[in-house]
UniProtKB/Swiss-Prot annotation:
This is Proline-rich receptor-like protein kinase PERK14. Its main location: membrane. The lineage of its organism: Eukaryota, Viridiplantae, Streptophyta, Embryophyta, Tracheophyta. GO terms for cellular component: plasma membrane. The gene is PERK14. It comes from Arabidopsis thaliana. The keyword Repeat does not apply. Residues 30-100, 107-129, 170-202 have a biased composition (Pro residues). Residues 678-691, 718-731 have a biased composition (Polar residues). Residues 1-264, 310-341, 678-731 are annotated as: Disordered. Belongs to the protein kinase superfamily. Ser/Thr protein kinase family. The active site is at 513 (proton acceptor).
Length: 731
């Protein structure tokens, strides 16, 4: 049976006499070679030589137990306390008789230590002087499977090997006591009480009862035994474990085994780590919270920006969809006008007749909610709608091309204008102009439903207007006569539509071909101005036209003198043309009529002196259409005559604006004695249409003489220089 590493077999009656090692062993915790002891017990087989463990963990591990062959006397366990550093001497095999003295097993050669394993139980208090008679040997708390031979308790300690520092020593199995009379073989390792009164301070084993003092103890010890608290692996109760205290001066400083010292706090590193981890968690939580707040802020900003952008786009869309309501209010006729959105009108089976040039169409139910992307038609679709552009569907022919009536798949009647090849700009310019015109919606303007581009073919699709043109009802339909009230209504409606183009559209749209043939009538004889903006498409035409056909520079008899002479076009050019239309409504005569069998006369030249007399208070009978048979309101007739006279003034800057004409026709203002100079605008081909600059308010002679100041019209159109045309305009 092997003894525990903390006890060695020795007779219990060993005398206290022993030799002490030199005092110099205290500082370096290594015992000098001890002198031979007194007669030892029967020789035991000396343990085999084992490598010396490092000094740090040497005291913590009891010497390796060696098998005791025949102990003569009951051994007294005097193991060195664990966690004591004592450099064990190399194992020596020296047979000696049993000694009455008890030798500490710390002098026996210790087992080798493995740095990766934990050191033996550090539970023994410092082994200083302990009262004799109490021999306590704490066995190691771990139970390794390997067993080592017990230490020869009778052999004197040989000289200590050189010191080594080592890490924690792995636990070893407790020695098995071979002698049955062992008083306390499994008691916890505590300093034993032996007869010698003065134990040496050195850590080498001596016959004295005092165990070597501890020098160094590991900071933390891992106990492999996980049994009940206070119980050793073999079932015995271990005393409280306390820290190892080094003796500093004398063996008198002893610690009673009954007063255990607290363990070296193992939890200090854990506590520090816990505090560090808590601080880390707190810091991480703060960072995560800050990131969440920043993310929420960014989301809120993005939401607000998106919402504002949507609001702005919806507001712009609403304004683009309802320009006529606001702008008409500015024109003074909000009560009678309403905004129009391009839609596909329902089928209307009314007769459409075109005469005198550019034909247009009118539909009482305006096409609604048809934008340009949906207004893109294929040539095959329009050809099928018009019956292959057959003659039976031909509505008329003008300077721009042919106009055919068509019916779309949904039953909507439209007027398809097929433009002449070579009389248009490039495809890009054509589409840009069509896009501009398609956004113009007004009660008194014919809506553009769509267009078609097929190779060199260009087609425009308009809403169909059932009641023909003003020209037809004034000059061609001799079977019926337009009453005065109807004539006044047509004049007011056409003036409102033209005022919208001039003052409410951006950029300003100049019609350039205002005439009775381009004023269409719906089923209620409400006027609708058509073909506005087409002059932009055909500014580069070189086609020759007769003086009776509609052409891009306007129709003879309607063109303003400055426009015919200089090619300049302004909003006042349209005002002049509208004055000619008013004269047609008053007199019932066309813009150019035959003076005699060989001479034609301009309506303006014929009516101008008569207007002066009528406005001055004389009778209107010689001016008014005789077919009316004096069935008219004199005041209304006087207002219309005053408007016509103001519109056909020779100087453009003296002509009123169309909004003023509307108010005068409605009787809100009088233009009889008011010299309306107005402010006109002109555009150069290199200018932005939005940059409106007054041109004509400073020098009225500029248009009277036809002189040019270097500016050309927005469209770059030059009037025809044929003498016949000039003669027709100026006659």
């Amino acid at each position: 049976m092997s003894l525990s590493p903390s006890s060695s077999p020795a007779p219990a009656t060993s005398p206290p006499a022993m030799s002490l090692p030199p005092a110099d062993s205290v500082p370096d915790t290594s015992s000098p070679p001890a002198p031979p002891l007194s007669p030892l017990p029967p020789p035991l087989s000396s343990p085999p030589p084992l490598p010396s463990p490092p000094p740090l963990s040497a005291p913590t591990a009891s010497p390796p137990p060696l098998p005791v062959e025949s102990p003569p006397s009951p051994p007294i366990e005097s193991p060195p306390p664990p966690l004591l550093e004592s450099p064990p001497p190399p194992p020596l095999e020296s047979p000696s008789p049993p000694s009455p003295h008890v030798s500490a097993p710390s002098g026996s050669p210790p087992l080798p230590f493995l740095p990766a394993k934990p050191s033996p139980p550090p539970s023994s208090p410092p082994s200083e002087t302990v009262p004799p008679g109490n021999t306590i040997s704490p066995p190691p708390r771990s139970l390794p499977s390997e067993s080592t031979p017990p230490v020869n308790t009778a052999s004197p300690p040989p000289p200590s090997p050189p010191r080594r520092r080592s890490g924690p020593k792995p636990s070893f199995p407790p020695p098995i006591n071979s002698s049955p009379p062992n008083p306390s073989p499994n008691t916890p390792s505590l300093p034993e009480t032996s007869p010698p009164p003065k134990p040496p301070l050195s850590t080498t084993p001596f016959p004295s009862s005092s165990t070597p003092p501890p020098k160094k103890s590991p900071a933390a010890v891992t106990l492999p035994f996980f049994g009940p608290a206070g119980q050793l692996p073999d079932g015995t109760v271990a005393p409280p474990i306390g820290p190892v205290i080094e003796p500093k001066t004398s063996p008198a400083e002893s610690i009673s085994p009954g007063t255990p010292q607290p363990l070296v706090p193992k939890s200090l590193p854990v506590t520090t780590s816990y505090h560090r981890s808590s601080a880390g968690f707190l810091f991480g939580g703060v960072i995560v919270g800050a990131l969440l707040l920043i993310l929420l802020g960014l989301l809120f900003v993005f939401y607000r920006a998106t919402r504002n952008r949507n609001n702005n786009s919806s507001s712009a869309h609403h304004q683009s969809k309802t320009p006529s309501k606001v702008q008409h209010h500015r024109g003074g006729n909000a009560g009678t006008n309403q905004a129009h959105v391009i839609t596909m009108p329902p089928p209307i089976h009314a007769k459409y007749i075109s005469s005198g040039g550019c034909d247009t169409k009118e539909n009482n139910s305006v096409a609604k909610n048809i934008s340009m992307p949906s207004g893109m038609f294929s040539y095959e679709e329009l050809s099928k709608a018009t019956g292959g552009f057959s003659e039976e569907n031909l509505l008329g022919e003008g300077g721009f091309g042919y106009v055919h009536k068509g019916v779309l798949k949904n039953g909507t009647e439209v007027a398809v204008k097929q433009l002449k090849i070579g009389s248009y700009q490039g495809e890009r310019e054509f589409q840009a102009e069509v896009d501009t015109i398609s956004r113009v919606h007004h009660k008194h303007l014919v809506s553009l439903v769509g267009y078609c581009v097929n190779g060199d073919k260009r087609l425009l699709v308009y809403e169909f207007v059932p009641k023909d043109t003003l020209e037809f009802h004034l000059h061609e339909n001799r079977g019926s006569v337009l009453e005065w009230e109807m004539r006044l209504r047509i004049a007011v409606g056409a003036a409102k539509g033209l005022a919208y183009l001039h003052e409410d559209c951006s950029p300003t749209i100049i019609h350039r071909d205002i005439k009775a043939a381009n004023i269409l009538l719906d089923s209620k004889f409400e006027a609708k101005v058509s073909d506005f903006g087409l002059a932009k498409f055909f500014s580069d035409t070189n086609s020759s036209f007769t003086h009776i056909s509609t052409r891009v520079v306007g129709t003879f008899g309607y063109m303003a003198p400055e426009y015919a002479s200089s090619g300049k076009v302004t909003d006042k050019s349209d005002v002049y043309s509208f004055g000619v239309v008013l004269l047609e409504l008053i007199t019932g005569r066309p813009s150019i009529f035959a003076k005699d069998s060989s001479t034609n006369q301009s309506l303006v030249d014929w009516a101008r002196p008569l207007l002066t007399k009528a406005i001055s208070g004389e009778s209107f009978d010689f001016l008014v259409d005789s077919r009316l048979e004096k069935n008219y309101d004199t005041t209304q007739m006087a207002n219309m005559a005053a408007c016509a006279a103001a519109c056909i003034r020779q100087s453009a800057w003296l002509r009123p604006r169309m909004s003023q004409v509307v108010r005068a026709l409605e009787g809100e203002v009088a233009l009889r004695k008011v010299e309306e100079t107005g402010n006109s605008v002109t555009y150069s081909s290199s200018e932005n249409p939005n940059d409106i600059t007054p041109r004509y308010g400073t020098n009225k002679r500029r248009f009277d003489t036809g002189s040019s100041d270097g500016y050309t019209s927005e469209y770059g159109v030059n009037p025809s220089q044929s003498s016949s045309e000039h003669q027709q305009v100026n006659t």
